[in-house]
A protein has these predicted regions:
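A cross-kingdom signal targeting lumenal/periplasmic-facing segments of multi-pass membrane
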Residues: 67, 71-77, 87-229, 233-234
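Short extracytoplasmic
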Residues: 40-73
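Alpha-helical transmembrane signal-anchor/signal-peptide segments
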Residues: 25-42
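Cytosolic-side transmembrane helix boundary signature
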Residues: 1-2
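Hydrophobic membrane-insertion alpha-helices, especially the h-region
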Residues: 5-21
Length: 237
């Protein structure tokens, strides 16, 4: 016989979809953010490349806006900004990927968890957990996910960023999707992912690079993504 979790998970997902569809019948759909004009410099980080995603990936993702770039920490290496840095084991570079979804009501696409899409692409999970980040816009909790593919090992930070809060857990994101659809008629969300390759410095150095970039990224991203028109103190970070 199937275990209780096997039965409850599909039931929950069906109930969630029904509630979101019902609640979003008069959905407040925000205007898309201008992600293409997102700053090329974030503190000590400078954009190195624009990294368009493949057409088949875009078709599967079905996001309304996508930002995919590589940034270099110029305070760590100011010698030159050429592509060979991307393949150096000591490169102070991170990959940024933001997928923004205007609506998650029935029939619309939803964010794909990196814990699903990365293993499906051949990456093997090595460690997972959550870490807290202090930023100039407040403290947030994000996922730290370490994956391996042949000789490459990456530290991945990711989170779900909505108009009212940042959420790390997938199930928490689903809960707040329903709650915010019921209360505020909003279902827009962004999946934010920061990737740093583990090189000679190992996971510790890669985590330091990823968290350093995320601290610079979050305040600017918070101001660029659609938010509720409420006093700042009423908005959950």
């Amino acid at each position: 016989m199937p275990d209780r979790r096997t039965i409850l998970v599909p039931v929950f997902l069906l109930a969630q979809a029904a509630l979101v569809h019902w609640a979003a019948g008069r959905e407040r759909v925000p205007a898309p953010p201008a992600l293409r004009s997102f700053p090329s410099e974030l503190g000590e980080w400078r954009q190195l490349t624009e990294d368009p995603i493949a057409a088949d990936v875009a078709g599967e993702l079905r996001a309304d806006q996508v930002l995919s770039r590589t940034y270099l920490n110029t305070s760590l290496d100011t010698s030159t900004l050429h592509s060979t840095m991307l393949h150096s084991t000591t490169r102070p570079a991170v990959g940024l990927f933001v997928a923004w979804f205007q609506s998650q009501r029935a029939g619309a696409s939803q964010p794909h968890s990196p814990k699903v899409c990365l293993p499906a692409s051949g990456w093997i999970p090595a460690a997972t957990g959550e870490i807290a980040l202090d930023t100039s816009a407040g403290a947030i909790t994000v996922n730290r996910y370490i994956v391996v593919n042949h000789e490459q090992r990456d530290v991945v930070l990711y989170w779900y960023q909505g108009p009212r809060r940042v959420t790390a857990g997938e199930w928490a994101a689903k809960f707040w999707l329903v709650a915010d659809a019921l209360r505020y008629k909003r279902t827009d969300i962004a999946l934010v992912r920061v990737v740093a390759q583990s090189g000679e410095g190992g996971d510790q150095a890669a985590t330091a690079a990823a968290t350093g970039f995320a601290r610079s990224l979050y305040p600017l991203l918070r101001e660029n993504l659609p938010r509720e028109n409420l006093p700042r103190e009423e908005l959950a970070r």
